[in-house]
Amino acid sequence: MVKISPLNLKLLRDVGQMKGQMFAVGIVMACGLAMMIMARSLIFSLESTRDAYYERNRFADVFSNLKRAPNSLRARLAEIPGVAAAETRVVGSITLDLPGLAEPADGTILSLPEDRPQQLNLLFLRRGRMPEAGSHNEVVAGEAFALAHGFEPGNTIAATIHGARQTLKIVGIALSPEYVFEARAGETLPDNRRFGVFWMNERELATAFDLDGAFNNVLLDVAPGGDRAGVVLELDRAGQEVWKVPLQGRPFHAVRY
């Protein structure tokens, strides 16, 4: 039989006299532990959902902006060691004339390939359809902007693209892994009434920005286990002096402008 020291006996008596307080402390500790487990489970669930969404819609690993590069460079990009898929596109800014706004809104417009399947940053179409090949002024609008203005497929928007005023017809509303929330570069909070994201057929958008036969944006998907830094270096070599800004990989998953 283990002998209990007088101090331990006193401790047990004191604990016995404070049953209510000890029970309350135990409840607080149990609640804290439960909250920690719930928070960790929620974080794990959100991360798993995010990763599955990015993988399902083939979110690119490397993005690069250019002034101009010929479409013939596309094949060279796909041959870079460690690259699983390469996508080139035209990206630009537009000004929007919207009713109810005292000042013009603005947006980003991105091209959709017509002569080949889209490989990266796939759109998830919520309503409507994609622009038809050879169509004129048909666009897909980001869902956040469409909801802020009550736009539906079939509505039109007055826009200025590279100095030319056009009437854009919304044929679809979509989500994109590239725009977890739709905001201007550098903004921490979205302003969905004054900024929107749109997608248009590549040939028409390239013509609007005087980029016929060329592109100004690159997306790369790095193969599993690939060296992202090495891919960026090879991309820089492939483009040589045509790149506009230093290349940047995807530093985090939370937001991509």
Task: Indicate residue ranges for each PLM-predicted region.
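Membrane transport/envelope proteins' first extracytoplasmic loop
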Residues: 1-257
